[in-house]
């Protein structure tokens, strides 16, 4: 049965991760949540008589043997002034794994059932405590991996997206009102002037929201950064430097990295998925050959490529092949490493020559850290267009569901403008206007189906 029809059940779930910790939070909600929980609390009358938004100290007890299970602090909320709009109990207990299991078992014994993923937030939505844009923002907030994504989710949780959609809806309904006035007072002597500017404004707002989706997805997925180059040029040293930890083995032996190593780091609030790849060279080692094939595949799919060159050594045939193939590729930054060593004159002259002077290059030393700030500046400039333009938008869309609905609304607006241009009967335009409003209502949840809600909330984590 759909969770929409089980909202009177008393539910319980662990709201914090299930591992040993100082504290954990177990949350519950339901019509009889306080009454049922009181049966396993050391002072039941105190809870039954307590007002909402109060905190109580006591013990979780086995209601049959009166054995103390844990010393706890209980937050009590009474309907309708709670997250779910129902009576709710949140228990702060010690984060012992066996203790958590035993406490939840006793919740189940007194009549609670385990909550399904997202069920607390679903109940909050059904109680009118939040709209769907805020519900989705909660999920985005929990799963945020970087400061920028986190900030965007907080912005939507504060109601920015709902307000934007609501404003567009009001503009479109104002357009409908204007048509109605013209129809009421239209005479043969008066030419009806449709306020197309209102629809054009809505079209522009929808375009911006749809455009923001690509930026949001890039921020969530992060930058795929591939470190490529010949063997022993310092790729693994650069990998460790970017991560600020020793993840890759650094050795003077060629071919130490035989397959790629992947890790993530955050830079300026943006997620980077960085790959340290096998050095490009001719080799008879089968495993290393596979690593090089994978390296080439990663290079083709990368958002950014740092091709590392050893300025103290000669350029290899693989270096020259790569430079020729990727010299006009805007994703590539040639990182000229080992400037702290005596430099190879031929290599230096090559990068100073007219043929390659236009290459995007930066000189560094992973050993002395020379040029590292310049490298960071180059990273900023390389990702600025695609990953650092969130300030261009007052609201950013990151939900696929929202993006698809916005595209539907935009298509309907385009169709509406076409009908206006064709002088379609004004009373017929009202049907199209209402269709746009309904689609926008699906974004906020004012118009939606049970199946949509079930599918959306099942992707939430337990306890939320």
Curated annotation (Swiss-Prot):
EC number(s) from the headed UniProt entry: 3.6.-.-
Gene name as annotated: mnmE
Name of the protein in question: tRNA modification GTPase MnmE
Transmembrane segments: none
Classification lineage: Bacteria, Pseudomonadati, Spirochaetota, Spirochaetia, Spirochaetales
Keyword Nucleotide-binding in record: yes
List of residues binding K(+): 251
Keywords: Cytoplasm, GTP-binding, Hydrolase, Magnesium, Metal-binding, Nucleotide-binding, Potassium, tRNA processing
Cellular location(s): Cytoplasm
Organism of provenance: Borrelia duttonii (strain Ly)
């Amino acid at each position: 049965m759909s969770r929409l029809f089980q909202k009177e059940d008393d539910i319980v779930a662990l709201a914090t991760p299930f591992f040993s910790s100082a504290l954990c939070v177990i949350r519950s909600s339901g019509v009889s949540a306080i009454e049922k929980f009181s049966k396993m609390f050391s002072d039941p009358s105190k809870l039954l008589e307590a007002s909402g938004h109060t905190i109580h100290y006591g013990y979780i007890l086995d209601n049959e043997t009166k054995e103390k299970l844990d010393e706890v602090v209980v937050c009590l909320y009474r309907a309708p002034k709670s997250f779910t709009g129902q009576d709710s109990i949140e228990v702060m207990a010690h984060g012992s794994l066996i203790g958590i299991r035993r406490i939840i078992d006793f919740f189940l014994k007194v009549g609670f059932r385990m909550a399904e993923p997202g069920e607390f937030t679903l109940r909050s939505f059904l109680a009118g405590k939040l709209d769907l844009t805020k519900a989705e923002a909660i999920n985005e907030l929990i799963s945020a991996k970087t400061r920028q994504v986190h900030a965007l989710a907080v912005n939507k949780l504060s109601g920015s997206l709902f307000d934007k959609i609501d404003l567009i809806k009001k503009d479109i309904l104002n357009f409908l009102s204007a048509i109605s006035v013209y129809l009421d007072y239209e005479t043969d002597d008066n030419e009806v002037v449709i306020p197309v500017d209102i629809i054009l404004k809505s079209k522009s707002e929808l375009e911006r929201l749809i455009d923001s989706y690509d930026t949001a997805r890039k921020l969530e997925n992060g930058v795929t950064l591939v470190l490529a180059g010949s063997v022993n040029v310092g790729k693994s040293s650069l990998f460790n430097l970017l991560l600020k930890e020793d993840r890759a083995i650094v050795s003077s032996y060629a071919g130490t990295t035989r397959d790629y190593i992947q890790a993530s780091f955050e830079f300026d609030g943006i997620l980077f998925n960085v790959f340290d790849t096998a050095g490009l060279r001719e080799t008879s080692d089968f495993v290393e050959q596979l690593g090089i094939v994978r390296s080439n595949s990663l290079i083709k799919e990368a958002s950014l490529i740092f091709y590392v060159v050893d300025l103290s050594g000669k350029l290899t045939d693989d270096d020259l092949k790569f430079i020729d193939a990727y010299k006009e590729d805007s994703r590539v930054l040639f990182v000229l490493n080992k400037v702290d060593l005596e430099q190879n004159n031929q290599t230096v002259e090559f990068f100073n020559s007219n043929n390659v002077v236009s290459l995007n290059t930066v000189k560094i030393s992973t050993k002395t850290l020379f040029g590292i700030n310049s490298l960071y500046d180059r990273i900023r400039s390389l990702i600025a267009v695609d990953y650092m333009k969130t300030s261009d938008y007052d609201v950013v869309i990151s939900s696929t569901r929202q993006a698809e609905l916005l595209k539907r609304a935009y298509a309907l607006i385009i169709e509406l403008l076409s009908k206006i241009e064709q002088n379609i009967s004004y009373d017929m335009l009202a049907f199209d206007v209402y269709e746009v409003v309904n689609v926008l209502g699906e974004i906020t949840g004012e118009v939606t189906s049970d199946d949509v809600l079930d599918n959306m909330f099942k992707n939430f984590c337990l306890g939320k």
